[in-house]
Amino acid sequence: VLAALKTATSVRAASDKVLTDFERPADQSETVKIKRASYGQKYYDKYTKAGATTPSEGGNNMNDRQNFVNTAASYIGCKGSDGSHKKIIDIYNEHTPLARGYKVKYTDAWCATFVSAMAIKCGLTDIIPTECGCGQMIALFQKLGEWQENDAYTPQPGDVVFYDWDDSGSGDNTGWPDHVGIVETISGSTFKVIEGNMSNAVGRRTMTVNGKNIRG
């Protein structure tokens, strides 16, 4: 990837190269390419201004990711059993427009709602779409050109990861996603995720990089 980026003559060229050669989403239309490149252009414009820092030097991109992770971690321990998860649901429901016009109930499954609520709290809804359903959220990521299904990809802190618990482990995991979380840390072949609705609470889980249950 780095070699491809170094030879690119523009943000658009670099974005298109990564999209077509590495991410390879089903939808590689011009609309998707333009939208994907616009995110890179935004950061390029920001970090090439005088006095700005690059993401690798601790600029806003890395700060946004860490803030997203830290915000999620601050809710660890919230549970459905004592009603403390209601504040998470409320954050989601107070954001407009509601995805598909649906107001989440306190008794609904709330893993995608949790991720969405953290994005709302951090002001990241332009790059992390809000949804209360995992499958629908994946569709929105695909529409934004942000969906990553490359087995060689190593998760980064702040990434949103989806699982299909019913996958057999034979072939690529393409089943319906059951759950979603936020990547907190990576250590060798494993990574730690913060999840909402993990046994009806916000908690941490350790996953294997490119494990059979990873949907994307």
Residues of each region from the PLM?
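Non-catalytic cell-wall polysaccharide-engagement segments
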Residues: 2-65, 211-216
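Sec-exported extracytoplasmic/periplasmic mature domains
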Residues: 1, 19-24, 45-49, 73-81, ...
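...with weaker cross-activation on analogous glycine-rich loops/strands in unrelated enzymes
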Residues: 6, 125-200
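N-terminal capping segments
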Residues: 53-124
